[in-house]
Amino acid sequence: MAIDDNKQKALAAALGQIEKQFGKGSIMRLGEDRTMDVETISTGSLSLDIALGAGGLPMGRIVEIYGPESSGKTTLTLQVIAAAQRKGKTCAFIDAEHALDPVYAKKLGVDIDNLLCSQPDTGEQALEICDALARSGAVDVIIVDSVAALTPKAEIEGEIGDSHMGLAARMMSQAMRKLAGNLKNSGTLLIFINQIRMKIGVMFGNPETTTGGNALKFYASVRLDIRRIGAIKEGDEVVGSETRVKVVKNKVAAPFKQAEFQIMYGEGINIFGELVDLGVKHKLIEKAGAWYSYNGDKIGQGKANAGNFLKENSAIANEIDAKLREMLLGNQDDKPDFTPAAHEVDEGSEAKENF
């Protein structure tokens, strides 16, 4: 609808005044020629990238990953760090639980020599560090592990048994208001790992809730619910777990999609097994009986052998991944590189059961 000349002049003057006072880009028309596509970072799982719709986790946003104990929350975030570092991005890990294992992180492909790490004393200190890193504009991905471990200063200085109603929720609410704008301006991805608690006296509906109040639920652009749904065995030995992730909230694509993948102890997400499954599903890989073939050449008998073939032939793995992303996401901007990096540990490293 056309605006009359007087209103147009008044609007132009107001916009000019706002840009003069607050800087260029502080206000604009939504349809202006400015990219609305959100840059993303791969989660390390192709099926989860597809479930997210945008091809990964969105930069400049807040993401919450929650689930029961030993469900793979920290493993998933370490895979995000590894994927970001392969793209030359700077990452930071705020270890509020004081439980980060650098040996395990290295096994997942994290360049620990270039990973910033902080073990804050209080929740306020952890969130101030996040804010300072975001405002610097030099850090691309920040992980906070976990919201439940962000203990308010008043609680630490008090005695065990003292009542501190709503302190953590108030601290998180204040931090979210401050962080959201700074993250958007700097394009920094902030991932909060969270734990599950049970609501007392819930007779109907889901009794589960997450810690830290409701502010994080509102400010998060993406919320992921991660669950361990089964064990992977070699003989009688458990070597990994079947994992399901549900996209509970998604502001950049359609929500409520699910992804299932394997997490192998000491190795992380079984990306090559995912490539085999998705390749067969979308007819890039042929399956005849137990044999798998790609472009007419047999690549292995059984899923495990086919996955090992792709692991040893990174060029073919990259090619299949690129085709799947083009087919299912319509882009290849954030495709990972499966060529082993120099900082990754040797194949013979002892596997470690660490979630």
From Swiss-Prot:
Can catalyze the hydrolysis of ATP in the presence of single-stranded DNA, the ATP-dependent uptake of single-stranded DNA by duplex DNA, and the ATP-dependent hybridization of homologous single-stranded DNAs. It interacts with LexA causing its activation and leading to its autocatalytic cleavage. Keywords: ATP-binding, Cytoplasm, DNA damage, DNA recombination, DNA repair, DNA-binding, Nucleotide-binding, SOS response. InterPro entries: AAA+_ATPase, DNA_recomb/repair_RecA, DNA_recomb/repair_RecA_CS, P-loop_NTPase, RecA-like_C, RecA-like_N, RecA_ATP-bd, RecA_C_sf. GO terms for biological process: DNA recombination; DNA repair; SOS response. Residues 331-355 are annotated as: Disordered. GO terms for molecular function: ATP binding; ATP hydrolysis activity; ATP-dependent DNA damage sensor activity; damaged DNA binding; single-stranded DNA binding. This is Protein RecA. Belongs to the RecA family. It comes from Erwinia tasmaniensis (strain DSM 17950 / CFBP 7177 / CIP 109463 / NCPPB 4357 / Et1/99). The keyword Transferase does not apply. It is found in: Cytoplasm. Its main location: cytoplasm. One of its GO terms (cellular component) is cytosol. ATP binds at residues 67-74.
